[in-house]
Amino acid sequence: IPVLVSTGQQQLAAIARAMACDPPLLVADEPTGNLDTRSADKIIQLFEGFVAQGKTIVMVTHDPSLTSRTHRNIIISDGELINEIISRSLPQLRHRHMLEFTKIVEEHIYQPHETIISRDGNVDYFFMIRKGEVDVVLLDNQKNENVISRLQAGEFFGEIELLRGGKSIANVRAGDQPVEVLALPRADFIRVINESPITAEAIGKIVQTRLDERQISD
């Protein structure tokens, strides 16, 4: 009798029907909608089991607790795709700002060990790493190079100088492999950060951590 079957059980039955033909791909539209936490967790555990078997699960959801458990997130705003690196690097931004950045960001490729930012140079962009690694390098009193940080895809740099002013405090260069970055012009970065206090606070904490790292290296 349908009335004796819980919403969670109905959802499990629907998934079982969908998987009966052993498809390589399952598209689930709000699979945990209207479910309690326990039932929703069962659904996600089931999906994780399918993924372990080599299947692909595509979920449409507005639930942040689900997106935190996925391998990849794609955000759509007003029918347009937001660049994944922007959403990973600046997750606190409003979606409209993410979409704006997606449209104006510049893509650059740097070869291994190529300088991206020179110490004491001007910083005109906020950089987000799309692929590869970059090294943040300082020189000690004997002019020896000291790599104080190695940043990877989804991380950013250039924010210290853009927010605090002044010249670059370190050399930033590509790692051992080519690096792909997204570069956001200074004016656009500052304007949007001023409109997003939560993002400004999050970046501010990272700025302080990096300044502390520099002091330790000195």
Please give the residue ranges for each predicted region.
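Hydrophobic anchor residue at the start of the ABC signature
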Residues: 15
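Helical segment within the ABC ATPase nucleotide-binding domain
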Residues: 41-53
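Conserved ABC ATPase signature
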Residues: 1-5, 9
